[in-house]
Amino acid sequence: MPRKGPVAKRDVLPDPMYNSKLVTRLINKMMVDGKKGKSQTILYNAFEIVRERSDKEPMEVFEQALKNIMPVLEVRARRVGGANYQVPVEVRPERRTTLGLRWLVNYARLRGEKTMEERLAYEILDASNNAGAAVKKREDTHKMAEANKAFAHYRW
């Protein structure tokens, strides 16, 4: 923990095309080896694929997808009297967004399509329709929280 108090949150700049901080955060989350330009190109091309496939604005589809991925509850380990309990806790709004973006990128990378643009586009489309691996991850997280509801009184 820092001795000089809490570390200030860095604010990201909105991206040039959609003027959205959320898109910038997704670009940063996808970035590998500091290649932000490449990450940006991949995302914008993926958004074009989304526009072609869904006949809707890609930002609308992306925001709906993210809404369907973001978890409300998660479990955190809490040690009580020599036993570890999985305690369900509510997820803070900032962490919800972060987890949603992380799961979207991770499960897009695991898909079978040929290019990352296609993988990301189809994962966004699937998530916006409440399908896909990222949405399944959210469902699994919620199931774990539901299964451990008995330990909710250990919250801190």
Swiss-Prot record:
Keyword Ligase annotated: no
Gene Ontology MF, one: structural constituent of ribosome
Secreted in keyword set: no
Keywords: Ribonucleoprotein, Ribosomal protein, RNA-binding, rRNA-binding, tRNA-binding
GO biological process: translation
Entry GO terms, CC: small ribosomal subunit
InterPro entries: Ribosomal_uS7 (IPR000235), Ribosomal_uS7_bac/org-type (IPR005717), Ribosomal_uS7_CS (IPR020606), Ribosomal_uS7_dom (IPR023798), Ribosomal_uS7_dom_sf (IPR036823)
Quaternary structure (record): Part of the 30S ribosomal subunit. Contacts proteins S9 and S11.
Similarity comment: family membership: Belongs to the universal ribosomal protein uS7 family.
Function of the protein: One of the primary rRNA binding proteins, it binds directly to 16S rRNA where it nucleates assembly of the head domain of the 30S subunit. Is located at the subunit interface close to the decoding center, probably blocks exit of the E-site tRNA.
Protein name, entry field: Small ribosomal subunit protein uS7
Organism annotation: Bacillus mycoides (strain KBAB4) (Bacillus weihenstephanensis)
